[in-house]
């Protein structure tokens, strides 16, 4: 189990470095002579037609709705694996990170809402600071991998996975457009076929690719966000086949490097480019970016740590062996690294088809500022709290 986690951490750490490079390249492109070409390239229309059926969207939307759906297949498989036989497979294992994740979602959302309570045009962005970027957070942990306890890494993984579940629920409930009943019926049929394939332990991945593609296209047309199709597909991949095959593990092993080294960096490059033209200190400290930044920097650590501490004091959960509350707080600060998921939710919050570019730019700047500070402070705290054995608190 520990060996699998170590391999996963190494992969995610390398992916985190690529994410950072992609984000920096995006900022350079958006604020240089290449700026017109960068934004024009992302708005290039790409159409796919099959008889009467067609999807015609800008390249940016293909990346956000299409490639990110593949990433969410991986998320779905990771969540399923952890629920069935991993760090969330029992009440005792799941309850401590569950309290952490709930606090890390509720408090940032409340801080954002409080700061933007008098600005109705910004209020739909309340979910932006709720997210944690697992690749970046694990990348920071990997820099100190030799001195960070394995239990602490497992805690962060479990917390991030529950955080992903929360993000999936939020996307499903709050970011759906006008619904198409025909598309929903087709999607429902595709889901039933996937569930049947799972029940009969069909292990041929090509079958899931075909039905999954139909599900993705119908969900896209239905008004529900298309990435949710990815989660459903991931959940329907069997953990084991009739003859002992491991289709979920095999597909996870195949998709993980593609997501870490291609899809997420491409998403970062496409979404992190923010033009700083016309930006001022007054704009950067306006309610929208301020709410996001403080939600990530204050809301995340306060929410994660306080919910963990209170749960332990109330006897509802136990502090995992080998870690202490100082280390939990360091991890809580790292949870303020919201980058990819926060940027993704910002795009959903402020419109995909006809977004307000000024609002999107301000929200992305708030995310980048909050993420950067959380990464630096989290690294310092984690290094300080894990540089020598500490007596467990609690």
UniProtKB/Swiss-Prot annotation:
The alphabetical list of record keywords is: Antiport, Cell inner membrane, Cell membrane, Ion transport, Membrane, Sodium, Sodium transport, Transmembrane, Transmembrane helix, Transport
Sorted alphabetically, the Gene Ontology cellular component annotations on this record are: plasma membrane
- Does the keyword Transmembrane helix feature in the UniProt annotation? yes
Q: Which organism is it from?
A: Haemophilus ducreyi (strain 35000HP / ATCC 700724)
GO: which molecular function terms?
sodium:proton antiporter activity
- Protein name in the entry: Na(+)/H(+) antiporter NhaA
Reaction(s) catalysed (UniProt annotation): Na(+)(in) + 2 H(+)(out) = Na(+)(out) + 2 H(+)(in)
Protein family: Belongs to the NhaA Na(+)/H(+) (TC 2.A.33) antiporter family.
InterPro entries, alphabetized: Na/H_antiporter_dom_sf, NhaA
Q: Which GO terms describe its biological process?
A: regulation of pH
Compartments where found: Cell inner membrane
Q: What is its main location?
A: membrane
């Amino acid at each position: 189990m520990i060996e699998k986690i170590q391999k996963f951490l190494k992969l995610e750490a390398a992916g985190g470095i690529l994410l950072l490079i992609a984000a920096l390249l995006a900022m350079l492109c958006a604020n240089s002579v290449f700026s017109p070409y960068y934004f024009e390239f992302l708005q290039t229309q790409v159409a796919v037609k099959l008889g009467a059926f067609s999807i015609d969207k800008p390249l940016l939307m293909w990346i956000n709705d299409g490639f990110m759906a593949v990433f969410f297949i991986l998320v779905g498989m990771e969540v399923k694996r952890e629920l069935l036989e991993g760090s969330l497979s029992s009440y005792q294992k799941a309850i401590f990170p569950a309290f952490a994740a709930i606090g890390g979602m509720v408090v940032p959302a409340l801080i954002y809402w409080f700061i933007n309570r008098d600005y109705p045009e910004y209020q739909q962005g309340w979910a932006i600071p709720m997210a944690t970027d697992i690749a970046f957070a694990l990348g920071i942990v990997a820099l100190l991998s030799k001195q960070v306890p394995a239990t602490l890494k497992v805690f962060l993984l479990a917390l991030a996975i529950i955080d992903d579940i929360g993000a999936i629920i939020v996307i499903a409930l709050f970011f759906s457009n006008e619904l198409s009943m025909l598309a929903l019926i087709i999607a429902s049929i595709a889901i039933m076929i996937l569930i049947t394939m799972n029940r009969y332990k069909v292990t041929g991945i090509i079958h899931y690719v075909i039905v999954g593609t139909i599900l993705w296209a119908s969900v896209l047309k239905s008004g529900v966000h298309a990435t949710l199709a990815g989660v459903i597909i991931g959940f329907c991949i069997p953990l084991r086949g009739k003859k002992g095959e491991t289709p979920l593990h095999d597909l996870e092993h195949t998709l993980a490097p593609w997501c870490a080294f291609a899809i997420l960096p491409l998403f970062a490059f496409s979404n992190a480019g923010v033009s700083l033209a016309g930006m001022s200190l007054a704009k950067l400290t306006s309610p929208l970016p301020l709410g996001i930044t403080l939600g990530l920097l204050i809301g995340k650590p306060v929410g994660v740590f306080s919910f963990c501490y209170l749960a332990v004091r109330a006897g509802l959960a136990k502090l995992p062996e080998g870690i202490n509350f100082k280390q939990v707080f360091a991890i809580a600060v790292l949870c303020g690294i919201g980058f990819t998921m926060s940027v993704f939710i910002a795009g959903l919050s402020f419109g995909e088809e006809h977004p307000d570019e000024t609002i999107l730019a301000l929200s992305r700047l708030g995310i980048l500022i909050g993420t950067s500070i959380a990464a630096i402070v989290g690294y310092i705290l984690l290094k300080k709290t894990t540089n020598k054995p500490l007596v467990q608190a609690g």
